[in-house]
Amino acid sequence: MVKVVLASRNQGKLRELREILRNRIFGLNVDTDVVDAASINAPDVPETGVTFAENSLLKARAVAESTGCIAIADDSGLSVEVLHGAPGIFSARWAGEHGDDTANLTLLLGQLRDISDEHRAAKFCCAASLAVPSALGGYEAVEYGELPGTLLHAPQGDGGFGYDPIMMPVELNGDNALYDGAYADQSCAQIPTEIKNSISHRARAFEALVPYLQQALEHK
């Protein structure tokens, strides 16, 4: 039974979200109760906002009202310090075509070709939102999460998606590294999925959203 719709057609994002929410919400079977927008023909919502939060809410609202289901959405991206926050909300289409990870990585690495390690600071950002349709009470919530890191000079690893192969999390490196430095010098595409999902920007945003989602499901 569909209880929650993820306002996205990105299968990588759906897999990641299911793992983030697994066993965190009473009465929710993430494998059967959480589906993506494409599986129930929900609309593909243009990202016309100018912030992650605006885009996230646009998608959640549209899907909630069109399907009558509780909808969750996120807008995520990479913010590079030396590029003054770019690619930001344009991360998924940085190279011109939405969702072309290889082209986006190639373009960004080219733009940073001459930037030394000490100036390659960046962070993953995520605004996660919940929209409950009018028939079920009609309310919204937005939460935010970040993962700071350093950008590598070349992709590393086959896991994850998006900019994961070039992002090395700060928290897994240095003198105070989590997990005793076992994952130092690894990109988000190399570290185990369960480790990534414990520190990622998306995990932090959606975990903050969990109480609102639990409340919505209890009153459904």
PLM regions: where:
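Anionic-ligand binding patches
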Residues: 2-5, 11-28, 32-33, 37-220
